[in-house]
């Protein structure tokens, strides 16, 4: 499946690059052959560009294992999107315009996206509804794709409300367990003491890697946690269920997992712009705008440089494509000729909501055309 992008390009080239002929098989010359040729080239490129955009939309959904684009409105996104340091860091440092085509190395990607960071929001659990009927925070569901031995980092982020005067805050994270004979229902995970000064509220992170790994090994032990953060006057500062004006302050888990890219061979090709008169196989610029699709579920990038391949692959280019020429010489009637296709593609990093309203930061392979060639 990882060769899908290449096959799509081969198909598109064959469809749009066949020379027009008359019904009797003879070519129809015109007085402005050169001008018409340039116009035809522009038309070919425009068709290729449109087809490339449609192919990208299909590939993204397929590689993310989504049957359709998640139906999440901008208002819902505003409520769910944490206004927290790790998420803002991902957005601020986003490498959306990377173009490493000058680098001769290639990444040999698998077909499906690889996950690097998962931001999981809490959900309600029946076990967390206490005797008084009030739900307690928090319960986190985890994807079966997360393997405990691949977890590099796991942090619980909580938002502490602002204070009016300097105070010491005692933070306690408790893990819920099945009731013991003595009635115990909690066991401690982390406790910490921190000083807060007047001003805006703050985000605080707590390492929960060991707890997460245990949950992944034994899913039945994941009954949820309770968060407490009291100041010196006994006021609970932890935002567990955001009130008015507290959108984006939900607790959440930030999980980072390993990802080991592979390297492959070197390749070279031509680069052109939209005004180029180059007839040979060439890479042309193409920017994909997700906002134009109405894909609000993609947090970042909002747009990226995808590029596309277009141009002719003639057998006269022997010094550039010797292997194809040898095949044609051995079987001239059995070869359909070389097609202009990507010979180097690289991934893009994407921050997005999946169908379960989880925020995923992952790498989608083969989404940027870095090199074009004839094959």
From Swiss-Prot:
GO biological process terms on file: muscle cell proliferation; negative regulation of myoblast proliferation; negative regulation of satellite cell differentiation; negative regulation of skeletal muscle satellite cell proliferation
Principal location listed in the UniProt entry: secreted
Subunit (UniProt): Homodimer; disulfide-linked.
Alphabetic keyword roster: Cleavage on pair of basic residues, Cytokine, Disulfide bond, Glycoprotein, Growth factor, Secreted, Signal
Disulfide bonds: 272-282, 281-340, 309-372, 313-374
Pfam families: TGF_beta, TGFb_propeptide
Gene name linked to the record: MSTN
Highest taxon of the lineage: Eukaryota
GO cellular component: extracellular space
Function: Acts specifically as a negative regulator of skeletal muscle growth.
InterPro entries named among the record's database cross-references: Cystine-knot_cytokine, TGF-b_C, TGF-b_propeptide, TGF-beta-rel, TGFb_CS
N-terminal signal peptide: 1-23
Protein name in UniProt: Growth/differentiation factor 8
Gene Ontology MF, one: growth factor activity
Organism: Excalfactoria chinensis (Blue-breasted quail)
Localization terms from the record: Secreted
Glycosylated residue positions: 71
Propeptide regions on this chain: 24-266
Family the entry assigns: Belongs to the TGF-beta family.
């Amino acid at each position: 499946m990882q060769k899908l992008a290449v096959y799509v390009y081969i198909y598109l080239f064959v469809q749009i690059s066949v020379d027009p002929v008359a019904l009797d098989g003879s070519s129809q010359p015109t007085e402005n052959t050169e001008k018409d040729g340039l116009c035809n080239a522009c038309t070919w490129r425009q068709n290729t560009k449109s087809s490339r955009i449609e192919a990208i939309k299909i590939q993204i959904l397929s590689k993310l294992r989504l049957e359709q684009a998640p139906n999440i409105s901008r208002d819902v996104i505003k409520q769910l999107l944490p206004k927290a340091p790790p998420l803002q860091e991902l957005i601020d440092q986003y490498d959306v315009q990377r173009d490493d085509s000058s680098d001769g190395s290639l990444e040999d990607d698998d077909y499906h996206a690889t996950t690097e960071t998962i931001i999981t929001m809490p959900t309600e659990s029946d076990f967390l509804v206490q005797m008084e009927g009030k739900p307690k925070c928090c319960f986190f569901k985890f994807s079966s794709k997360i393997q405990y031995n691949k977890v590099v980092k796991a942090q619980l982020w909580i938002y502490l409300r602002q204070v009016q005067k300097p105070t010491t805050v005692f933070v306690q994270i408790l893990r819920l367990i099945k009731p013991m004979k003595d009635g115990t229902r909690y066991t401690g995970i982390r406790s910490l003491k921190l000083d807060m000064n007047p001003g805006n509220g703050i985000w605080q992170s707590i390492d929960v890697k060991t707890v997460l790994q245990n949950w992944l090994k034994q899913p039945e032990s994941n009954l949820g946690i309770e968060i407490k953060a009291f100041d010196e006057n006994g006021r609970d500062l932890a935002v567990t269920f955001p009130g008015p004006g507290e959108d984006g302050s939900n607790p959440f888990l930030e999980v980072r997992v390993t990802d080991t890219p592979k390297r492959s061979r070197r390749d070279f090709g031509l680069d052109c712009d939209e005004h180029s008169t180059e007839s040979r196989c060439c890479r042309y610029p193409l920017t994909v705008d997700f906002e134009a699709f109405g894909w609000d579920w993609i947090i970042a990038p909002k747009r990226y440089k995808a590029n596309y391949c277009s141009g002719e692959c003639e057998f006269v280019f022997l010094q550039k494509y010797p292997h194809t020429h040898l095949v044609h010489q051995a079987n001239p009637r059995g070869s359909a000729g070389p097609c202009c296709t990507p010979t180097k593609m690289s991934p893009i990093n994407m921050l997005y909501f999946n169908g379960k309203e989880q925020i995923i930061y992952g790498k989608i392979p083969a989404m940027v055309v870095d090199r074009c060639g004839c094959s």
